[in-house]
Amino acid sequence: MISDIRKDAEIRMEKCVEAFKNQISKIRTGRASPSLLDGIVVEYYGTPTPLRQLASVTVEDSRTLKINVFDRSMSAAVEKAIMASDLGLNPSSAGSDIRVPLPPLTEERRKDLTKIVRGEAEQARVAVRNVRRDANDKVKALLKEKEISEDDDRRSQDDVQKMTDAAIKKVDAALADKEAELMQF
């Protein structure tokens, strides 16, 4: 029983950390990354479609993304969707390819992005703590029903706390890496 609760909590905490890492990978740094355009949705014959389903995105150099649209008639719609996004990008067509140069980040924009990343980190920490609370509540319910002893309850809470500390440490490490990446010129 307790081991199931512990495993469930560990899996959920790991998912919180992975979701945070995935979320901050989409935040633009000075470096080109195909994941930057993951959130772009293009109107494809009246249907909102993710860019990844309509084109391949590759890194041409450290400051340029190259988009190869599978259906050439969709090039204009892809460009329009990129411009409409709040990423501040200005794509240009070159035949069947679309090039997206990434302008260097200003100091002010870097600080804004750092604040956003810190906010995401705090949300991830809160999510991890909520998982801890849920696990501890389940164990307390078992204690009330006299299915486990108080020693088991205490031991379980200590284990869950260690898992929580480890997950928060991972979030903090990812945050520090992203902040360092954002502040590089």
Curated annotation (Swiss-Prot):
Q: What GO molecular function terms would the record report?
A: ribosomal large subunit binding
Give any Pfam family that matches.
RRF
Q: Which Gene3D superfamilies match?
A: 3.30.1360.40, Ribosome-recycling factor
Q: Which SUPFAM superfamilies match?
A: Ribosome recycling factor, RRF (SSF55194)
Q: What's one GO BP annotation on this UniProt entry?
A: cytoplasmic translational termination
Q: Which domain of life is it from?
A: Bacteria
What are the alphabetically sorted keywords of the record? Cytoplasm, Protein biosynthesis
Identify the GO cellular component terms for this protein: cytosol
Please tell me where this protein is predominantly located: cytoplasm
Compartments in which it is found? Cytoplasm
Q: Which InterPro entries match?
A: Ribosome_recyc_fac, Ribosome_recyc_fac_dom, RRF_sf
PANTHER family according to UniProt: MITOCHONDRIAL RIBOSOME RECYCLING FACTOR PSEUDO 1, RIBOSOME RECYCLING FACTOR
Tell me, what does this protein do in biology? Responsible for the release of ribosomes from messenger RNA at the termination of protein biosynthesis. May increase the efficiency of translation by recycling ribosomes from one round of translation to another.
Assigned protein family? Belongs to the RRF family.
Q: Provide the protein name.
A: Ribosome-recycling factor
